[in-house]
């Protein structure tokens, strides 16, 4: 089946990487530029709608979009033959392309690790999905927010590195 070979698979993996990335970074920006700043303005009796319904659903898509972006990105790097050179930041090839795409790859990997190993575990505590003391709940909310802000700041140079890798010079 020609559809399952060569350029079609590469196209499909790239498409999944880009769509997953748009969803991931879009939700990241939603959390940081819409939800977090709006929470103090929401009356206390309405906050459970966010913390019990909207946030858990958004976090579901957020964390799985992060994982799928990384998986499809690594598959694409392997398909196109630059996985090793990209992860080595171009030191193995002296290529500006590999350096830039590698910087983007590493920032994306750091961001995904932040999502799965810091943001999500702390959000479960902050949203009451895991039973913790009120002090631990507040600390978890702050930790999740700080790492989410870190990811927001990394998202701009990460995106720039990914895009500019295709136009070195």
Model-based region annotation:
Residues 1-169:
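Polytopic transmembrane helical bundles with strong interfacial aromatic enrichment
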